[in-house]
Design a protein with these regions (language model features):
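C-terminal regulatory or interaction extensions
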Residues: 1-167
Length: 167
C-alpha cells in the first residue's frame, strides 16, 4: 500500500523483513528482492535500481536534501517505509553541495551521515557513529579519517567533532 500525506509518503508491504534484515542493518545488508511490484514502482520513481542500491539511494537523497532519515519499521505482519517531505536543515544542504562541488565528487553516504550526525549532536564517539551508519568500526573510522583529512571534522579524543566554522 502507498499512503500519501502532506508531510510524508508511507509505503507498507505485507510480511516482515526477510531473515537477517533489521531496522539496524537495512542500509548495509545485501539486497534480497521481496516484492517485485513495489520494487518496480520505486524504480519508476528513481528511488531503486536493480543493483540492490535502493535503500542507499533513498537514504542518500534524504540526507543530501536535508530531510529526516527514511524510517523503516518492521511488524510481525508488515514492513513500512516512511519518507518525509519536510526539509530539516537547509544549511546542511548548502554545505554538502559546496563540499561536493569543491571536491568534484559525490560524498559517500556514510560520510554524509557522519557529518549530519555531528552537525546535530556536536560530538560523537566512533562506536556511536558506527551504529548510526550501520558499518563496522574499521569502516566507520576510515570514513571519519576521510572527513578529518578533508578538514571537515576533528578528533578530540575520544570524540569526533565538526570543525566549528564549517558547520
Amino acid at each position: 500500500y502507498v499512503k500519501q500525506y502532506p508531510d510524508r509518503v508511507v509505503i507498507e508491504n505485507p510480511g516482515g523483513f526477510l531473515d537477517g534484515i533489521t531496522e539496524d542493518n537495512i542500509i548495509t545488508h545485501p539486497s534480497i528482492p521481496r516484492n517485485k511490484l513495489i520494487a518496480e514502482t520505486l524504480q519508476n520513481l528513481k528511488y531503486v535500481q536493480r543493483t540492490g542500491q535502493g535503500v542507499d539511494i533513498i537514504f542518500k537523497d534524504m540526507v543530501s536534501m536535508g530531510k529526516p532519515y527514511p524510517r523503516y519499521r518492521s511488524f510481525n505482519d508488515a514492513v513500512s517505509l516512511t519518507i518525509f517531505s519536510a526539509i530539516d536543515n537547509t544549511e546542511f544542504v548548502k554545505f554538502i553541495t559546496e563540499v561536493q562541488d569543491k571536491n568534484s565528487k559525490i560524498m559517500p553516504l556514510a560520510e554524509m551521515m557522519i557529518l549530519r550526525d555531528l552537525m546535530d549532536n556536536r560530538k560523537e564517539q566512533l562506536s556511536e557513529l558506527s551504529r548510526k551508519v550501520q558499518k563496522s568500526l574499521d569502516e566507520t573510522k576510515k570514513s571519519c579519517n576521510e572527513l578529518v583529512n578533508s578538514g571537515l571534522i576533528e578528533i578530540v579524543s575520544p570524540y569526533y567533532m565538526p570543525i566549528v566554522p564549517l558547520l
